[in-house]
Amino acid sequence: MLHRYLPMTEEDKKEMLQTIGVQTIDELFSDIPESVRFKGDLKIKEAKSEPELLKELSQMASKNANLKEYASFLGAGVYDHYAPVIVDHVISRSEFYTAYTPYQPEISQGELQAIFEFQTMICELTGMDVANSSMYDGGTALAEAAMLAAGHTRKKKILVSSAVHPESRAVLETYAKGQHLEVVEINHKDGVTDLDVLQSEVDDTVACVIVQYPNFFGQVEKLADIEKIVHQQKSLFIVSSNPLSLGALTPPGKFGADIVIGDAQPFGIPTQFGGPHCGYFATTKAFMRKIPGRLVGQTVDSDGKRGFVLTLQAREQHIRRDKATSNICSNQALNALAASVAMTALGKQGVKEMARQNISKAQYAKRQFEAKGFTVTFAGPFFNEFVVDCKRPVKEVNDALLQKNIIGGYDLGRDYKEHENHMLVAVTELRTKEEIDTLVNEMGAIQ
C-alpha cells in the first residue's frame, strides 16, 4: 500500500535507478563532493497526525493580527474593504478555479465571458477604450505601461512622480534597467507632483510621464494641468489609479490619459501578505495592438450566436516571442473574476456609495485628528488616505495601537526621509465611528 504523501516504494526506487544506469543513490550523487554532503539525521520533529498538525497550525495562526479582530487603518496600496459574500462562492466553483487563461478558448466560454466582463467594467471605470484581461499587480501594470510608451515613442527617458507608490517605482526601475531606460523622479510639493519641476523636465527625449491618482499620500493630483504639460512634447500620459476611487472621481480618461493602470485589490480581493493581487491595464484604441497580456474579444460564431475568443494573440510571446509586445504571457484570471463579481454585486450605485463612504469617513477622521491637536500634513483634496504628523516614531505609535487591537497606518519614514514620524492613515467604508474615535483618542494619549 502506498503512503498517502510519499507514493514511492523500494521497488519504484530500484526501477528508477536501473533505468538511469546506476546501482545506488550514493552513486547517483557521486559528483557531489563528500565534504559538502549532509550526513546524519535531520533535526526535525517527528511526524504528526492530521488533528495534531491542524491544532498546532491553528495555534501559530492565532498569533497573527487579523482583520476580524483588529480595526485596520493601514492602506498604502492594500485596503480592508467589504467583499460581497457571493465572491468566494463564485470563484470557488470548479469551472473557474484556476488562475490561468485557456489556450483553447473556444472550450471555456464561461471563463472568457467573465474576463470580457472584467475588461468592460475596467473601461467604464477608467474612461478608456480597451482593457486587458488583468496583470499580476499594480506595480507590474505600471512598469508594462512604461515599456509600451518607450517602445511606441522610441524615447529612453521616463518621468515618474515621487508621489507614486514606492514599490511600483521599484518595479519600474527593475524593468527599466533591463531595457537601458532612464527613470527620473519628479519631486512632490504639498503632497502632489511639483508642476514647475515637471515642466522643466519634460522635453523631446521623454517617453512618458507617470503619476498616481489619488497618489501615495492620498492626495488627488491635478490631472488636467499635468496632461497639458505632458502632451506638449508628444509624450504619453500614464495614470495609476485606485479603481474604487473612480466611483467618485472623474476618470483619468476624461483628462486625456493615454494609459490607465492600477490594482483591482479594492474589489473583492482580500488583504494578504505578498498578494496575489490583480493589476489592470486600460488604454485607447491607438495602442490596442501594443497592449501587453491577454485580450478577450466578443464575436459571432457560424450559427450567429455570441461567442468569446482570445484576440490579437500575435502580440504575445507564445505566438511570436521575438516580436512580442511583452514577456507577460499570463494574467490573474481568478482574481479578475473576484473583482468582476464584486463590482457586479455592488452595481454602479453600490460602487459610487462605497467610494462616497470612503471619502466621508476619511474626512471625519481628519477632522477628529485636527480637533485632537494633530497636524494633517497636506491640505489638498484626498480620497480615503491622509498624512498625520505623529511627532514621534510611527513604529512606537503602531506598537502601542496593536495592544488596543488597532492596526495603525503606514510609516512614511520608510520611504521618505522628509516624512519621518509621519503616518499614512487609511479609512475605508468598513471603519466605524467608534473605531475612528478610538484610534484618535489612543494616538492622542500616546503623544
From Swiss-Prot:
It comes from the Bacteria. One of its GO terms (molecular function) is glycine dehydrogenase (decarboxylating) activity. It catalyses: N(6)-[(R)-lipoyl]-L-lysyl-[glycine-cleavage complex H protein] + glycine + H(+) = N(6)-[(R)-S(8)-aminomethyldihydrolipoyl]-L-lysyl-[glycine-cleavage complex H protein] + CO2. SUPFAM superfamilies: PLP-dependent transferases. GO terms for biological process: glycine decarboxylation via glycine cleavage system; nucleoside metabolic process. It is an enzyme of class 1 (oxidoreductase). The glycine cleavage system catalyzes the degradation of glycine. The P protein binds the alpha-amino group of glycine through its pyridoxal phosphate cofactor; CO(2) is released and the remaining methylamine moiety is then transferred to the lipoamide cofactor of the H protein. Belongs to the GcvP family. N-terminal subunit subfamily. This is Probable glycine dehydrogenase (decarboxylating) subunit 1.
